[in-house]
């Protein structure tokens, strides 16, 4: 609001929200007068896709959510003729994982092949996002992703303190733990199955 932006907050609900994350959305949007849209994924379809990815034993088990978020955000932006998607991605706290720890989170071809092999349902309502769709939204619809936190010194601890003090924001316990699934993946699953401890990258 201080920047004078006319913001539409978009929540992609994949069924794994922590209670704190849901309340945080309300605590931020309502007092600031931010318009809010929720894109709810089909739970039966989405959990079947997630189960397929787990069965495939690839490391990057968050591919379904990563693709769905990009797909939903661009669809909402196109629907409302919005030209800029503001991302919280930043150089200060993101992009820290070793290359061997992750894979392209936008590989829709991989996801479709995994679902075809291990899944029981078709991807009928899943908001896809692939290379051709990225070109369409970027060059035809002129939609750009802006990493706004890279344009000024970003201090995560100070940002969290401001959110807590001014908007009654509550911490959910860890990096990306706003999702119950992500907290399970990063704190247990990837550590036990692949010996990957995200804390090593985060703390270093």
Which residues are covered by each model-predicted region?
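Nucleotide-activated chemistry modules centered on ATP-dependent adenylation/adenylyltransferase
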Residues: 3-204
């Amino acid at each position: 609001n201080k920047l004078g932006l006319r913001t539409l907050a978009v929540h992609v609900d994949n069924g794994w929200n922590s209670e704190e994350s849901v309340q945080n959305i309300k605590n931020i949007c309502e007092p600031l007068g931010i318009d809010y849209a929720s894109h709810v994924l089909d739970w039966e379809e989405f959990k079947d896709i997630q189960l397929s990815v787990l069965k495939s034993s690839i490391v990057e088990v968050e591919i379904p959510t990563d693709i769905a978020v990009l797909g939903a955000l661009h669809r909402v932006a196109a629907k409302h003729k919005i030209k800029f998607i503001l991302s919280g991605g930043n150089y200060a706290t993101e992009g820290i994982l070793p290359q061997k720890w992750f894979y392209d989170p936008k590989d829709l071809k991989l996801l479709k092949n995994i679902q075809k092999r291990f899944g029981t349902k078709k991807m009928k309502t899943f908001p896809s996002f692939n290379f051709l769709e990225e070109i369409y939204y970027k060059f035809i619809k002129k939609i750009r992703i802006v990493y706004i936190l890279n344009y000024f010194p970003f201090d995560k601890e100070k940002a969290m303190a401001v959110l807590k003090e001014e908007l009654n924001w509550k911490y959910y316990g860890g990096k990306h733990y706003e999702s119950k699934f992500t907290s399970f993946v990063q704190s247990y699953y990837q550590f036990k199955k692949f010996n990957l401890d995200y804390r090593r990258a985060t703390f270093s």
